[in-house]
Regions:
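Cysteine-dependent deubiquitinase/ubiquitin-like isopeptidase catalytic cores across multiple families
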Residues: 18-20, 78-124
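Active-site-adjacent substructure of cysteine-protease-like catalytic cores
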Residues: 111-165
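Noncatalytic regulatory segments and standalone regulatory/sensor domains
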Residues: 153-215
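Hydrophobic, Leu/Ile/Phe/Ala-enriched alpha-helical segments that form helix-helix packing faces
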Residues: 40, 44, 96-103, 128-129
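Active-site nucleophile-adjacent alpha helix/oxyanion-hole segment immediately C-terminal to the catalytic cysteine
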Residues: 1-78
């Protein structure tokens, strides 16, 4: 069984949500100037219909500075800038709480490499997806880490085997709902999952998640 968050659909524009009109959700480097965590957050906010795609890709977007959207836009696009090398999820949660508390609430969880912690991530992921919420997910591999947006999972005989994600580092087909997959528990050891894109694959573990909900 495959479960994808409600509202995502394939149109001539690719994977979209409907917010006044069809809004393409996937953002790739070049659409915005910034780090993978911020890309993933903005895809999340588009999927939640908090922002339109044009609002996050057009850096000339004008918001009143005293509104919640104006404050958030200033935090990410003006005060910090998007090319500072990224944020920890805890920093992003703080910014969301500071600037966007009327619009959304967020929670951060961190995970060790233990079997129990990685299983806790899968439980958190299932709860989020079943509630039709994307989950910003940090994967760690040898020599680095990367932030992606989980939008669904595949369950086989009651066990989640795969997690479907939108990765801002890669292109996406116009006919696809996702462009990367985490295949769970593929090997023993620290990097127990396999992360697959159309270009490569890496052994990874999940180190952190950020869940955002509309109020």
């Amino acid at each position: 069984m495959i479960k994808i968050i409600r509202g995502l659909d394939i149109t001539a524009l690719g994977v979209c949500v409907y917010n006044r009109k069809w809004q393409p959700v996937h953002l790739q480097q070049g659409d915005m100037d910034g780090a993978c965590a911020v890309f993933s957050i903005m895809m999340n906010l588009i999927a939640l219909k908090v922002f339109t795609r044009n609002q996050v890709t057009n850096l000339n977007t004008s918001f009143k500075g005293n509104t919640s959207k104006g404050r958030l836009f200033k935090e990410f696009f003006v005060t910090q800038g998007l090319c500072r090398g990224g944020f920890y999820f805890s920093e992003i949660k703080e910014k969301l709480s500071h600037s966007f508390a009327k619009e959304v609430m967020s929670s951060v969880r961190q995970y060790a490499t233990s079997v129990s912690d990685q299983a806790s991530y899968v439980e958190e992921l299932k709860i989020a997806i079943d509630d039709n919420l994307p989950l910003v997910t940090a994967i760690t591999f040898r020599g680095g880490a990367h932030a992606i947006l989980a939008i669904g999972y595949e369950e086989q005989e009651g066990v989640i085997r795969k997690i479907f994600c939108l990765d801002p580092g890669y292109t996406i087909s116009q006919t696809s709902l996702w462009n990367s997959v985490i295949t769970l528990n593929e090997r023993k050891g620290m990097y127990c999952h396999q992360y697959i894109t159309d270009n490569d694959d890496k052994n990874v573990f999940v180190s952190e998640t950020l869940k955002i909900e509309r109020k």
